[in-house]
Amino acid sequence: MKPIALLFALLLPTLASAGVYDDMLNALRAGDTPAAVALLNRGVDVNTVDVEGNTLVMLAVRENNAELLDQLLLRRARLNVRNRNGDTALRLAAFDGKLPFVQRLVEAGAEVNMYGWSPLSYAAFNGHAPVVDYLLRRGAEIDAKTENGSTALMFAARNGHLAVVESLLKAQADPNIANESGETALDWAGKGNNSDIVQRLRAAGGVSGKAAAPSK
């Protein structure tokens, strides 16, 4: 076989596979679950990623496709892969408050605790109390810190999510942890002009970072 013909023959499987993967991503984004499942049955790698590093599991979460997510879980798709933004599928589900997806992922073995922004922090940031409660029941570290030392309680306090603040305090979140800037949840609540949360934190023993030693 001539070199050019040989090279073309070697490339054919790669080109075909790339086309099949594109079909899979397109079917998922279009919500065409039967087509996506058919492609999985043809052997599409369940751990395929798009150009941004999003896995099929992440895309199923983003597109609210629980049926396809279940198919991917049955095929043991990897759950703790991070995309280019450093997010996992569970983080994305928690950020959007998609409790059924959060439950499916955790029950399938997705990591609840991780370095940096945790799924709990994501859920607290956006005020998704049911997701916060579920993650706490499943072992989420309540006082886990982001890279700058901020906690889920701080995010909920800053953004005015009283129900989440209540859940976290009931679960014994520490209101006096200070981040790298020396600020506590009380300081963050004040910045957000959330007077009801300021009162609740004070009732729980919360103080300003001026009185609380920075947490190490």
Place the predicted regions along the sequence by residue.
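Ankyrin repeat boundary/linker residues
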Residues: D50, N83, N113-G116, T146, ...
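Conserved ankyrin/ankyrin-like repeat signature
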Residues: A35, E67-L68, P100-F101, P130-V131, ...
